[in-house]
Curated annotation (Swiss-Prot):
Gene Ontology biological process terms, A to Z: protein refolding
Name of the protein in its database record: Chaperonin GroEL
UniProt-annotated binding residues for ATP: 29-32, 86-90, 413, 479-481, 495
Gene (name only): groEL
Family annotation (NCBIfam families): GroEL, PRK00013.1, PRK12849.1, PRK12850.1, PRK12851.1
Length: 538
């Protein structure tokens, strides 16, 4: 396939045009008064969004050279989204500002390699400054503010704060469609898994068709139970206590199932049998989770624990167990809190190591079940288009909130980046030549987000920047929604430090790459051969 090449200034200008097209489409969404963008879909209704990464992903330019620039900016947005879940528009605005200023200097004869070095040194100092001003989240209110700013909705902020309140930092929060127009949070308490009772004869509440066991003992094993003889000693011990028994095993059949059902019907021993959740290695891990949560042991051949030798100490305990046709919920497991913490830490480490998205999801689910539950945000809307857009905003806000829990919060509205210029000033003084110019490029770019927020809200960015910098309070900034100057922390205009940091680092990374580009190579488009037309007489 023949290729077309572009060199030097011509190549960089083509990249710049591509960058501008994407950035100009994305930056209109920045801030509380940012506009929406409507995206045509090849099927279904159009998507309405103000999420930077969703807009960037949809853009594919006709000119192949310009498209290379567009793809690089897309990379900034998606990388920031992957790391922090938000801040994609800020990252795009920063990248555009650095690229524009940088290309001016390269055209004037500056050395691109030295410019990149200066950019990197300035960004390093700015990131240190961001980390310095970050504050830990102080409670539910802060969580609500972070989520509300990301989703541009106080209602969504409250929902996420409620969900996080219930499940804690390690809990899992999922987003699903609601069957109504309402958006609300549904909470599943305790350890829940998708396996129900083996026989309907175990049912204690015929109206709801469920089994309710109060303060039961829990027998956990990875074996198939069919012969009753090995189980008789432990069944007798449990029957003497007068408490119910939940049996979790690979399968329960034959004599064992008959014995449990008959004892339940006679009233000798209230019990219920369910199959173990998962398959293979995952099943073993989940049984171990249940054992740790309830303070029991897994009666497994691998561990050398025989069913005949089981004592009441080997059984798990819980406050309550509910078993339906296809789900089991264990509430108030009596396991050692320290052992549960260790298990959660172990799963956390596995999450960090794994590269598979599926594996990550299943590990997070296991961790949430140990940590105390799963919250589901049910999203309702009048139309399919609104539902998609709302779900997307909630997912973004969730990611931003998790980022805030991780690295803390900083004043929002572009103020933190603007004030990070002070740290860059010191770098500029230390550097010389083209490296100094590189640091100045970052200095100038750090004011771009706040300028854009102000312009989207109909204000003059330069005037607002001057007024903010006249006050030394690091939290003093401009509330673009109300058009007032205020303390950003007190007003609840806050950003996760991780989002601000990632946006700056990713923007600088792409800007550096683009400035040091000398040649562009693209494939020559194939000339379409015209198909001969059929003569009219046919």
């Amino acid at each position: 396939m023949p290729k077309i090449l572009k060199f030097n200034e011509e190549a960089r200008r083509a990249l710049e045009r591509g960058v501008d097209k994407v950035a100009n489409a994305v930056k209109v969404t920045l801030g509380p008064k940012g506009r929406n963008v409507v995206i045509e879909k090849s099927w279904g209704s159009p998507t309405i969004t103000n999420d930077g990464v969703s807009i960037a992903k949809e853009i594919e330019l006709e000119d192949k050279f310009e498209n290379l620039g567009a793809q690089l900016v897309k990379e900034v947005a998606s990388k920031t989204n992957d790391v922090a879940g938000d801040g994609t528009t800020t990252a795009t605005v920063l990248a555009q500002a650095m690229i524009k200023e940088g290309l001016k200097n390269v055209a004037a004869g500056a050395n691109p390699i030295l410019l990149k070095r200066g950019i990197d040194k300035a960004v390093e100092k700015a990131v240190e400054e961001i980390k310095k001003v970050s504050k830990k989240l102080s409670g539910r209110e802060d969580i609500a503010h972070v989520a509300a700013i990301s989703a541009n909705s106080a209602e969504i902020g409250e929902l996420i704060a409620e969900a996080m309140d219930k499940v804690g930092e390690d809990g899992v929060i999922t987003v699903e469609d609601s069957k109504t127009l309402e958006t609300y949070v549904e909470f599943t308490e305790g350890m829940q898994f998708d396996r129900g009772y083996i026989s309907p004869y175990f049912v204690t509440d015929a109206e709801k068709m469920e089994v309710v066991l109060k303060e039961p003992f829990i027998l956990i094993t990875d074996r198939k139970l069919s012969a009753v003889k090995p189980l008789i000693p432990i069944l007798e011990k449990v029957a003497q206590t007068g408490r119910p028994l939940l049996v979790i095993a690979e399968d329960v059949e034959g004599e064992v199932l008959t014995t449990l059902v008959l004892n339940k019907l006679k009233g000798t021993l209230q019990s219920c049998a369910v199959k173990a959740p998962g398959f293979g290695e995952r099943r073993k891990a989940m049984l171990q989770d249940i054992a740790i949560l309830t303070g029991g042991q897994v009666a497994s051949e691998e561990l050398g624990i025989n069913l005949e030798d089981l004592t009441l100490e080997d059984l798990g305990r819980a406050d309550l167990v509910r078993v339906k046709k296809d789900e089991t919920i264990i509430i108030g497991g009596k396991g050692d809190p320290e052992a549960i913490k260790k298990r959660i830490a172990q799963i956390k480490a596995q999450i960090e190591e794994t590269t598979s998205e599926y594996e990550k999801e299943t590990l997070q689910e296991r961790m949430a079940k140990l940590a105390g539950g799963v919250a589901v945000i049910k999203v309702g809307a009048a139309t399919e288009t609104e539902l998609k857009e709302k779900k997307h905003r909630i997912e973004d806000a969730l990611s931003a909130t998790r980022a805030a829990v991780e690295e803390g919060i900083v004043p929002g509205g572009g103020v933190t980046l603007l004030r990070a210029r002070k740290a860059v000033e010191k770098v500029i003084e230390e550097l010389e030549g083209d490296e100094k110019i590189g640091a100045q490029i970052v200095y100038k770019a750090l004011s771009a987000p706040i300028k854009q927020i102000a312009e989207n809200a109909g204000y003059d960015g330069a005037v607002i920047i001057e007024k903010i910098l006249s006050n030394d309070d690091p939290a003093y900034g401009f509330d673009a929604l109300r058009g007032e100057y205020c303390n950003m922390f007190e007003r609840g205009i806050i950003d996760p430090a991780k989002v601000t940091r990632s946006a700056l680092q990713n923007a600088a990374s792409i800007a550096g790459m683009l400035l040091t580009t000398e040649v562009l190579i693209v494939e020559k488009p194939e000339e379409k051969k015209e198909t001969p037309s059929i003569p009219e007489e046919f």
